[in-house]
Regions:
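Conserved N-terminal structural module of periplasmic/extracytoplasmic solute-binding proteins
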Residues: 3-15, 22-106, 251, 285, ...
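Conserved C-terminal helix/tail region of periplasmic/extracytoplasmic solute-binding proteins
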Residues: 42, 71, 163, 374-426
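Extracytoplasmic/periplasmic substrate-recognition and gating elements
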Residues: 62, 165, 232, 236, ...
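Extracytoplasmic "Venus flytrap"/periplasmic binding protein-like
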Residues: 63-129, 138, 163-165, 172, ...
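Hinge/lid segment of periplasmic solute-binding proteins
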Residues: 103-152, 178, 292-294, 362-364
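Long, aromatic- and glycine/proline-rich binding clefts that accommodate carbohydrate-like moieties
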Residues: 132-136, 294-295, 343-390
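Extracytoplasmic/periplasmic solute-binding protein
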Residues: 144-148, 153, 178-224, 267
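Glycine-centered hinge/linker elements that transmit conformational signals in sensory
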Residues: 181-182, 223-251
Length: 426
């Protein structure tokens, strides 16, 4: 099956009584274009906290008013509880017109019938969207959202530790990376890399790099594919990286926070999101000048390692009375001007490779961007959400392999639990 972008959520039951802010303006009457064609109307957009920087929001709102005559109203949402809130809003008669949805949540919302088909818009403005970034917006062959912005993991390293080990450049291939870790290990003063045994999303990136699928279809249901040789190859790579680390084999990157471990100054590198460098700096201001970034290298210099892509799409609520006006918003917000401005102001990866120049000067974003085209996520099926619920059986698999169990035996030990979770009805 085709790999997709973050674990799709389970379709939760529609709960009455939840509050959803919608639009109360009159419906569009036919297709209209040009200044003032939608004069007097208001388009309501739900966007997540932190997604819309002030400059971008101000400029886009003004441009939207100038182009359409309509007013743009952003309503900021918190991540906590958002899946239920969106699901409820999409079931109501006056939903928000446009909604920012987590990229892997998109197929689940589309499956409920809550999102509009944007296939015509894709044909008009999405010809050069990065395929890997657009994948989560497609469900059953139709375009139900538009890719907005993304982020992925990079190698965050301590330049002083690397220089002390005689390393003069960042690695461009996986083998070069291992040689650098060997050099740091030989120097003996620092832990080459901090990698706990359950950094699940880094492992998922390795499976993507190996072309592996974590689930497969058997009849009309999905089952675990953890015993597949490609998954095994990814786990063997993870094991090789983890052997350079003193981190616990039964913990993830948040226990303890890996950036805080790195901040102590005696770790060569860790694999994380660019913003985690800020966590390290907050813990130890002195380390700021020693922090550098590079793309996680793949087998060859021309293709980075696979990465887990996180991000957001814009979707139009099927129940919105302003379908045409919503599409005008998407055309403008996803234009090169505003997609590029968002990338520059928020340091996020844009939906087109041609816009990556807007990341210049942002070391973490520059390191992340090259891998976006070869990125992916966990399976884009609603059933997947239950698999990642704690305790995640794949994390148990990882720890078992790192502690000496064969990948085949470790997979066999958890596949029944994975299959049980995949069979749960939302």
């Amino acid at each position: 099956m085709k790999r997709g972008l973050i674990a799709a959520i389970g379709v939760v039951a529609l709960l009455a009584g939840a509050t959803a802010c919608g639009s109360d303006d009159k419906a569009d009457s036919g297709k209209k274009t040009g200044p003032d064609s939608y004069k007097g109307q208001t388009l309501t957009v739900w966007a997540m906290d932190g997604s819309t920087p002030p400059g971008w929001t101000k400029d886009l709102t003004a441009a939207f008013k100038k182009k359409t005559g309509a007013t743009l109203k952003f309503q900021t949402q918190k991540w906590d509880g958002i899946q239920q809130k969106i699901t409820t809003a999409l079931s109501e008669s006056t939903p928000p017109d446009v909604i920012e949805v987590g990229n892997t949540q998109t197929p689940a919302y589309a499956a409920t019938g809550g999102l509009s088909d944007l296939s015509d818009l894709k044909a008009e403005i999405g010809g050069d969207w990065v395929e890997a970034l657009n994948e989560s917006s497609v469900f059953d062959g139709k375009q139900y959202a538009a890719p907005w912005y993304f982020a992925n993991r990079v190698v965050i390293y301590n330049k002083k530790v690397w220089a002390d080990a005689g390393i003069t450049d960042t690695p461009k291939t996986r083998d070069e990376f291992f040689k650098d870790l060997d050099a740091i290990k030989k120097k003996g003063k620092a832990e080459p890399i901090y990698l706990p045994g359950q950094n699940w999303y880094f492992f998922d990136g390795l499976t993507i790099g190996q072309g592996a699928d974590l689930v497969k279809k058997e009849g009309d249901k999905y089952v675990s594919n953890l015993s597949d040789p490609k998954v095994t190859a990814a786990m063997e790579l993870y094991k090789k990286y983890q052997a350079y680390s003193k981190a616990p084999k039964d913990k993830d990157e948040a226990t303890p926070q890996q950036a805080e471990v790195f901040a102590k100054g005696n770790v060569g590198a860790f694999i994380g999101m660019g913003w985690e460098a800020g966590t390290a700096i907050a813990a130890n201001k002195k380390i700021e000048s020693d922090i550098g970034y590079f793309t996680i290298p793949g087998e060859t210099a021309d293709k980075p390692e696979g990465v887990f892509l996180g991000g957001s799409n814009f979707a139009v609520a099927a129940g919105s009375k302003k379908q045409d006006l919503a599409k005008e918003f998407l055309k403008l917000s996803l234009s090169d001007q505003f997609e590029g401005q968002l990338a520059k102001e928020n340091g996020v990866i844009p939906n087109k490779e041609s816009l990556n120049s807007n990341l210049t000067g942002n070391g973490a974003a520059e390191a992340a961007a090259p891998a976006a085209a070869v990125g992916g996520t966990t399976p884009l099926i609603p059933e997947w959400a239950a698999v990642e619920n704690a305790p995640n059986p794949i994390k148990s698999y990882m720890t078992a392999v790192l502690n000496g169990k064969s990948p085949a035996d470790a997979a066999k030990a958890v596949e029944a639990e994975i299959n049980k979770r995949l069979s749960q009805k939302s």
